[in-house]
């Protein structure tokens, strides 16, 4: 049985190349805005359906379909740069996010040994740069603990 079916999530290594990770992170950091009233999480910046990330979702679609053995329809893209102190509360996704992917682009931590996991159910998963987790967003509760770093440090994620 596939890990997506068994565990409700599947870790995928090297879903994005290092060059693509660098390009996307550089783009997002240049366009960083903090304090957006629409951001439900403290200490974060985000964009929904920005042109570049919408293109990325379509670029990643064949890989995600291959990994899931499903024909999928992209609904939206979401890009977030979490800053120190951010937290993602435990939740399940809305119906449109039946199959989701969370891809770590890049991060900058005060301590190079620090790890900030995405928790799937009761399992903390450290997603390395360029890797991703495909998951059943409506079925498995997921969250992140408090990002225990000073505000000038960050973690960049694509959904």
List the predicted regions and their residue ranges.
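Non-heme Fe(II)/2-oxoglutarate
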Residues: 1-68
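Generic beta-strand or strand-like secondary-structure segments
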Residues: 59-63, 78, 100, 104
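Conserved active-site beta-strand element of glycosyltransferases/polysaccharide synthases
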Residues: 81
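Accessory, usually C-terminal, subdomains that scaffold auxiliary metal cofactors
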Residues: 148-152
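Catalytic core of non-heme Fe(II) oxygenases with the double-stranded beta-helix
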Residues: 84-139, 143, 153-156
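A short coil-to-beta-strand element that immediately follows conserved catalytic motifs
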Residues: 69-78
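Short, charged interaction patches at domain edges and termini
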Residues: 159
